[in-house]
Amino acid sequence: MVIKPRVRGFICVTTHPVGCEANVKQQIDYVTQQGAIDAGPKNVLVLGASTGYGLAARITAAFGCGANTLGVFFERGSVDGKLGTAGWYNTAAFHKFAEEKGLYAKSINGDAFSDAVKAETIETIKRDLGKIDLVVYSLAAPRRTHPKTGEVLSSTLKPLGKSVTLRGVDTDKEIVKETTLQPATQEEIDGTVAVMGGEDWQMWIDALHEAGVLAEGAKTTAFTYLGEKLTHDIYWNGSIGEAKKDLDQKVIGMRQQLAGLGGDARVSVLKAVVTQASSAIPIMPLYLSLLFKVMKEQGSHEGCIEQVYGLYKDSLYNSEPVIDQEGRLRADYKELQPAVQDRVKQLWDQVTSENLYEMTDFVGYKQEFLRLFGFEIEGVDYEADVDPDVKISNLIQL
């Protein structure tokens, strides 16, 4: 079949297997060109390993550190000629390239929040790797079935305490408009913390620790975003921010837990990038379009792979990490420079539907968005016939 992008709202309902493979290859090439990371991890578990920052963390571990990687995610392959998800095709490509390099790569497809996936992961580590020395937590999900109660919890993107009116861009109609969001109820806040907070990360570390599969010196990190004033109402000071603050609280206990192994636990702050998760946040497409314009002009623009490679090299595996007062590892400092934020704010107030393309890098935003699904990748023939049925070698399906 010939596959073209079909976008509905903040999701692209088609995916391109060959484009996804080319996208993964570009990220691998970037890491390879940067060179090996000294004293990097050897056996790595990535939770949420199929797209965005999680995929970048897996690529950096394998191709920057020569690590064996075990990935966990919830994706869908092709059934009856229908297209699989981008994360499925990304992982098929990652496995292929890792195996060509002689690197161990295995993945578990299932609900990472469940006890069954945790148990299967532990058995796989014991059987194949013995122990792991890095756990990357990069799950972004709209819902979580609590493994102990069976309750289905949902995350919401809402402000706290009062309604908030935000500028944004309707990416379908390509118009700048204002959206008013009502404040989250306590139930919605609690649900968001349960889905996107630190409880499941803690459960993973507890389970791995109790099973004796964490190596001496094992580290764990979860990814977060802080942002600046423009995004605070909906993000850091909103329901999702409560979940991110929960990560900051839970990591303290995990740090003490891993200290017994000579290890460490840190939250890592990364810059705003286009992901399937961020494109769903009302303010983010406009903010990112402006951020891209300003950071490209200043020569400091980075995507997922540049951010994560830098995080490994400068902080996770560096004796002098970039760390803030709260103990978080920081890779977002280029985004937060006053010269960047002041310029973004200045342009923010001037953007209209009429000058959207002129004032922002909306073209770059749309391109990055489509790249998530395997489109807009240089060197890919999008007129060619493509088989949607791509198998993932060494996949454990739960």
Curated annotation (Swiss-Prot):
Annotated binding of substrate, by residue: Y225
Pathway: Lipid metabolism; fatty acid biosynthesis
Biological processes, Gene Ontology terms: fatty acid biosynthetic process
E.C. number(s) listed in UniProt: 1.3.1.9
UniProt site (Plays an important role in discriminating NADH against NADPH): E75
Binding site for NAD(+): 48-53, 74-75, 111-112, 139-140, 244, 273-275
GO terms for MF: enoyl-[acyl-carrier-protein] reductase (NADH) activity; NAD binding; trans-2-enoyl-CoA reductase (NADH) activity
Keywords annotated in UniProt: Fatty acid biosynthesis, Fatty acid metabolism, Lipid biosynthesis, Lipid metabolism, NAD, Oxidoreductase
Catalytic activity: a 2,3-saturated acyl-[ACP] + NAD(+) = a (2E)-enoyl-[ACP] + NADH + H(+)
Catalytic residues as annotated in Swiss-Prot or TrEMBL: Y235 (proton donor)
Job description of the protein: Involved in the final reduction of the elongation cycle of fatty acid synthesis (FAS II). Catalyzes the reduction of a carbon-carbon double bond in an enoyl moiety that is covalently linked to an acyl carrier protein (ACP).
Oligomeric and partner information: Monomer.
Family statement drawn from the similarity comment of this UniProt entry: Belongs to the TER reductase family.
Name of the featured protein: Enoyl-[acyl-carrier-protein] reductase [NADH]
